[in-house]
Amino acid sequence: MCPSGRIAIPITTTANPNFRPAFEIIDTDHDGKISSDDLRAFYAGIPSGENNDETMIGTMISVADANKDGFVEFDEFEKVLETTPFSRSGNGGDDGLMKDVFKVMDKDGDGRLSYGDLKSYMDSAGLAVTDDEIKSMIRLAGGDLNDGVSFDGLLKIFGC
């Protein structure tokens, strides 16, 4: 235990590649760390509007920010997700976070990610992908070009 009464959690340097895509989506300015501005921008894409509360954003940063620099680096992000029980499978991760990612990507709110949804989001996130790569993602997720990808399919794409 630290003198402050907090428990020290060692941060590993072995990155879990399953969390990298989620981190890159939330890191909207692509500077390698998640800031309060990144979270505001991320949650602005979710139709409910309730998730951009400043107190909640501050809490999210402070919970994950192990080195107290005001940002969440990938290793800190990874540590939070690895220690949070995955409500569906127990594999480690945050189902709620992934649902938020899904909502941001689902532009028309129909509960499925279409080819257009995936292409649009990848472009807006600065991730250069070809049409064939988008089609491969849809196939990997168990979807097709007509029906798109479900939430569970998105988890397959991210390797969760």
Swiss-Prot record:
A Pfam family annotated for this UniProt entry: EF-hand_7
Annotated binding of Ca(2+) 3, by residue: 106, 108, 110, 112, 117
Tissue: Expressed in roots and flowers.
Residues holding Ca(2+) 1: 27, 29, 31, 33, 38
Cited InterPro entries: Centrin_CML-like, EF-hand-dom_pair, EF_Hand_1_Ca_BS, EF_hand_dom
Entry coiled-coil feature ranges: none
GO biological process terms on file: hyperosmotic salinity response
Keywords (A to Z) from UniProt: Calcium, Cytoplasm, Metal-binding, Repeat
Induction info: Induced by salt stress.
Keyword Transmembrane: no
Protein purpose: Binds calcium in vitro.
Protein name: Calcium-binding protein CP1
UniProt organism field: Arabidopsis thaliana (Mouse-ear cress)
Record lineage: Eukaryota, Viridiplantae, Streptophyta, Embryophyta, Tracheophyta
